[in-house]
């Protein structure tokens, strides 16, 4: 099981120990997809303080860790899922909508669900007519949102970059990288 992985070698940031550190704002090795999303906010100098974000996902891989990372940046966070009532209304109130459903047959984020100028981060991946697509109707949302990530080519590469970053960090912690040993 994942709990058998040493927390200082946990480059995915998903061991119970690292998840616990994340929930207290002290994690060093953080889950890659949420970290990649936060890195995008930093790169584009998006001030998150006081913003309202809706995360459409409650998984241990994306939704829950992302909730904690956004809280660290003083974001008001609403977590939505398959049982959430009035999802459209929640999304329409949000400055940031992050969707990670990953099943286009069950959910598509459409432009009428997003307020003008919102930021849309699409983590979902589905196959449609032999193409990879996200949860968001990209073309219509692009006309309404201030930012929207594409699928493929948006969050996915950032996830890989954060995995590499965590690998270097773990190697440094374990004194196996650049220490001459």
Enumerate the predicted regions with their spans.
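Glycine-rich phosphate/diphosphate-binding loop of Rossmann-like nucleotide-binding domains
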Residues: 27-119, 128-142
């Amino acid at each position: 099981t994942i709990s058998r992985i040493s927390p200082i070698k946990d480059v995915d940031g998903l061991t119970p120990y690292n998840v616990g550190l994340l929930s207290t704002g002290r994690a060093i090795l953080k889950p890659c997809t949420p970290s990649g999303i936060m890195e995008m906010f930093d790169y584009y100098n998006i001030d998150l303080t006081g913003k309202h974000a809706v995360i459409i996902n409650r998984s241990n891989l994306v939704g829950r860790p992302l909730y904690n990372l956004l809280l660290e940046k003083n974001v008001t966070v609403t977590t939505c899922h398959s049982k959430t009532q009035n999802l459209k209304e929640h999304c329409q109130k949000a400055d940031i909508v992050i969707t990670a459903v990953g099943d286009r047959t069950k959910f598509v984020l459409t432009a009428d669900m997003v307020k003008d100028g919102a930021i849309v981060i699409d983590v979902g991946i589905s196959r449609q007519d032999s193409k990879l697509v996200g949860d968001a109707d990209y073309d219509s949302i692009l006309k309404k949102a201030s930012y929207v990530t594409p699928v493929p080519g948006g969050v996915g590469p950032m996830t890989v970059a954060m995995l590499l970053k965590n690998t270097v960090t773990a190697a440094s912690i374990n004194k196996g990288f650049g220490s001459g040993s």
